[in-house]
Amino acid sequence: MYEPTLTVESFDSELAGAIRDERRRQEHHVELIASENYVSPRVLELQGSVLTNKYAEGYPGRRYYAGCEFVDIAEQLAIDRAKELFGADYANVQPHSGSQANAEAYMALMNPGDTLLAMDLSHGGHLTHGSPVSFSGKFYKAVHYGLNAHGDIDYEQAAQLAQEHKPKVILAGFSAFSGIVDWQRFREIADSVNAYFMTDIAHVAGLVAAGVYPSPVQIADVTTTTTHKTLRGPRAGLILAKANPELEKRLNSAVFPGSQGGPLMHIIAAKAVAFKEAMQPEFKTYAQQILKNAKAMAEVMKERDYTIVSGGTQNHLFLVSLLNKNISGKEAEAALGRANITVNKNTVPGETRSPFVTSGLRIGTPAITTRGFKEKEASQLAHWVCDILDDIHNEKVIADVKQKAHELCGKFPVYQELD
């Protein structure tokens, strides 16, 4: 049924209700999931624009459909801005997600059965870094390095595994590591075995763009990322690379027609405006505050006798190990959720429980920083988290924290300009 004047509210009240309730949840819950953020009204607007109607297989100036002259402008803006923002020589803005960006980069760099050396999932890696349940572990032979006893990446182990297995690709990147990656050291390990060096900066892309976290873009052969998380754009992917005409051609072919058809032009336009937002001076201030808030929270939890993997944080997240607390990550996540504090359970080094239960929590500060929280609020929030974890079955404590969290959220609305 096509009726231009009929709203979702009047046509599909069930769906409208779910969206309304999710809007309310985002306003009244404290978001501490490290991979989540709040996009700007501009990003929201573009994702609902008429660009969603246009098929545009191919690349700007080389399309398989007519009528692409205006979406070409949008995509070229996204490409040019991505290259400028990250100091890249090449950018492909068509990947639908970070996972797809990884799959496409692998396709350009490896053949099925080749060896991939990446971080172990239980030490902070990602499913697409060679987990046996992922395409990356099914199509390629995955070998994994982890963290050392000090909670840092075990570069010596990575170098030893590289010499032993001679991987085609060495990947540096993470989903739950709170330190700074030594990109150059990985470059040297890759060069020692004539491997491609690939980086996945999905979690820290916004920090890299702002210049508050080291950039691997001109060190690695290929860099992938999501465009949400710390970058605060739409949920999608991006591939970057330093100059290499042959590799650029293979990357383009891996994206289209290798694994995707028509690009999502409304999402690409949203990427373009998000990249422009990230170029503003205010974005660097935002990224710096993310780091300050994460450090403030981690310090409070350490003072309250909680174990922080790697001993602290140098980015936007930190991992709390509950191995010595007789609390599972699942229990902790649920208890905090009842207090309107959203976190995610996470595996930790030395994990003894299943990935569905876990012994840890991952905590991140991009979303609360977007709301306007600073160190004062971040520290206060960390104390509330500890209050609940200290007495996890005490519903009175949970109810008290829920009220405090509700009041705090009321002082820092997410989308006040849309009300």
From Swiss-Prot:
Keywords of this entry: Amino-acid biosynthesis, Cytoplasm, One-carbon metabolism, Pyridoxal phosphate, Transferase
GO molecular function, one term: glycine hydroxymethyltransferase activity
Cofactor section: pyridoxal 5'-phosphate
Places the protein is found: Cytoplasm
Annotated Gene3D superfamilies: Aspartate Aminotransferase, domain 1, Type I PLP-dependent aspartate aminotransferase-like (Major domain)
Catalysis: reaction(s): (6R)-5,10-methylene-5,6,7,8-tetrahydrofolate + glycine + H2O = (6S)-5,6,7,8-tetrahydrofolate + L-serine
Any one Gene Ontology BP term: glycine biosynthetic process from serine
Positions contributing to (6S)-5,6,7,8-tetrahydrofolate binding: L121, G125, H126, L127, S354, P355, F356
Residues annotated as site: Plays an important role in substrate specificity: H228
InterPro entries named in the record: PyrdxlP-dep_Trfase (IPR015424), PyrdxlP-dep_Trfase_major (IPR015421), PyrdxlP-dep_Trfase_small (IPR015422), Ser_HO-MeTrfase (IPR001085), Ser_HO-MeTrfase-like (IPR049943), Ser_HO-MeTrfase_PLP_BS (IPR019798), SHMT-like_dom (IPR039429)
Subcellular location, principal: cytoplasm
The protein's Enzyme Commission number: 2.1.2.1
Listed GO CC annotations: cytosol
Pathway annotation from the record: One-carbon metabolism; tetrahydrofolate interconversion; Amino-acid biosynthesis; glycine biosynthesis; glycine from L-serine: step 1/1
Residues where N6-(pyridoxal phosphate)lysine is found: K229
SUPFAM superfamilies: PLP-dependent transferases
Pfam family, one: SHMT
Top EC group: transferase
Subunit structure, as described in the record: Homodimer.
Function: Catalyzes the reversible interconversion of serine and glycine with tetrahydrofolate (THF) serving as the one-carbon carrier. This reaction serves as the major source of one-carbon groups required for the biosynthesis of purines, thymidylate, methionine, and other important biomolecules. Also exhibits THF-independent aldolase activity toward beta-hydroxyamino acids, producing glycine and aldehydes, via a retro-aldol mechanism.
Family per record: Belongs to the SHMT family.
PANTHER family named in the record: SERINE HYDROXYMETHYLTRANSFERASE
Identification of the protein by name: Serine hydroxymethyltransferase
Gene responsible for this protein: glyA
